[in-house]
Amino acid sequence: MGLFGTKKIGKYEIGRTIGEGNFAKVKLGYDTTNGTYVAVKIIDKALVIQKGLESQVKREIRTMKLLNHPNIVQIHEVIGTKTKICIVMEYVSGGQLSDRLGRQKMKESDARKLFQQLIDAVDYCHNRGVYHRDLKPQNLLLDSKGNLKVSDFGLSAVPKSGDMLSTACGSPCYIAPELIMNKGYSGAAVDVWSCGVILFELLAGYPPFDDHTLPVLYKKILRADYTFPPGFTGEQKRLIFNILDPNPLSRITLAEIIIKDSWFKIGYTPVYHQLSDSIKDNVAEINAATASSNFINAFQIIAMSSDLDLSGLFEENDDKRYKTRIGSKNTAQETIKKIEAAATYVSLSVERIKHFKVKIQPKEIRSRSSYDLLSAEVIEVTPTNCVIEISKSAGELRLYMEFCQSLSSLLTAEVS
């Protein structure tokens, strides 16, 4: 392959740089097993740790793994080395939407098609509790047929039911007024605003809000101070006006755009895609169950799956640290009692440090509060199914193994 040198990551030959950010480079990759191209996002682990962005990287991986939609970039696998994290993704050959725009407006039919694909993808995310929060042309890619693909979920959020998000993020020209006000906000409404800015840019060739100084730019956004150039139709103006409403409570929703807007609906065919089979049943079980303070979400299920366990992504190999996960067909409270019983059986004491998390130590050193031998956390999957995550931070491996065996035997005996 002329495009590729001798550098390889796993089964992938690594070629030229096709994208670059603050903490990562995206390289063109070649899968030697099937002859296909991929995009390999290579993240500098040390730099991410230095900036405290571990959770953001994990969030991007988990989000991309969860979502399965033709207008969202797909993730294939994650490869970790001592210094790098490599996310192997679908290769989108057409480049960024921002390159296609280049201060030049699109034909109405092309703009509508891309906007429909954007809305369809974002609506798919929102229906699964995922909010992008940084939608902009630089994060929208085009494939060889001109179809749109949403990428870069590093700022995405999955809040608890009814929660308001509070982290300010996004790019200045595309952020919603409520982000500028630095108040709690709805991730759904923020994404809708960004979609409106993108639609304006598709039709005009430039964004509605732009200025060299941030204070002036923010004032324009807060007042929704923009002017339509010649050529915009009444239907286009009405839709953009309803989207770029500074009040998130009265701003049009995605459902209203899809169902009610006449301009949007021209030639629109919604895409219905399901979650991947490996997690579909788990997510369905979650949606049917009642919520709790420690209720597991789909992202945690993915993180616990054998093909995408991110728990050690930023940890150096250390023979003194161990982690085990055991399933329990009990309520969370009953599972805590099982943990206490298993610990007692092997002469360990249990101290609750959170509602569903305990510290486990040999009884004779209980007074030494700085000595943490084991910890066990109960994560509720459904009201009668839990996952117990057991971690060893210090002490003898023998005691850790004895406790795990004791708990496993206790839980196995009750279902046999």
Swiss-Prot record:
The modification Phosphoserine is found at S156. Its EC number is 2.7.11.1. Residues 291-315 form the NAF domain. The modification Phosphothreonine is found at T167. Residues 321-351 are annotated as: PPI. ATP binds at I18, G19, E20, G21, N22, F23, A24, K25, V26, K41. The keyword Phosphoprotein applies. The active site is at D134. GO terms for molecular function: ATP binding; protein serine kinase activity; protein serine/threonine kinase activity. It catalyses: L-seryl-[protein] + ATP = O-phospho-L-seryl-[protein] + ADP + H(+); L-threonyl-[protein] + ATP = O-phospho-L-threonyl-[protein] + ADP + H(+). Its cofactor is Mn(2+). Gene3D superfamilies: Kinase associated domain 1, KA1, Phosphorylase Kinase, domain 1, Transferase(Phosphotransferase) domain 1. InterPro entries: Kinase-like_dom_sf, NAF/FISL_domain, NAF_dom, Prot_kinase_dom, Protein_kinase_ATP_BS, Ser/Thr_kinase_AS. Residues 152-178 are annotated as: Activation loop. Keywords: ATP-binding, Kinase, Manganese, Nucleotide-binding, Phosphoprotein, Serine/threonine-protein kinase, Transferase. One of its GO terms (cellular component) is plant-type vacuole membrane. Pfam families: NAF (PF03822), Pkinase (PF00069). Residues 12-264 form the Protein kinase domain. GO terms for biological process: cellular response to osmotic stress; cellular response to salt stress; signal transduction. The activation loop within the kinase domain is the target of phosphorylation/activation by upstream protein kinases. The PPI motif mediates the interaction with the ABI (abscisic acid-insensitive) phosphatases. Interacts with CBL9. Belongs to the protein kinase superfamily. CAMK Ser/Thr protein kinase family. SNF1 subfamily. CIPK serine-threonine protein kinases interact with CBL proteins. Binding of a CBL protein to the regulatory NAF domain of CIPK protein lead to the activation of the kinase in a calcium-dependent manner. This is CBL-interacting serine/threonine-protein kinase 21. The gene is CIPK21.
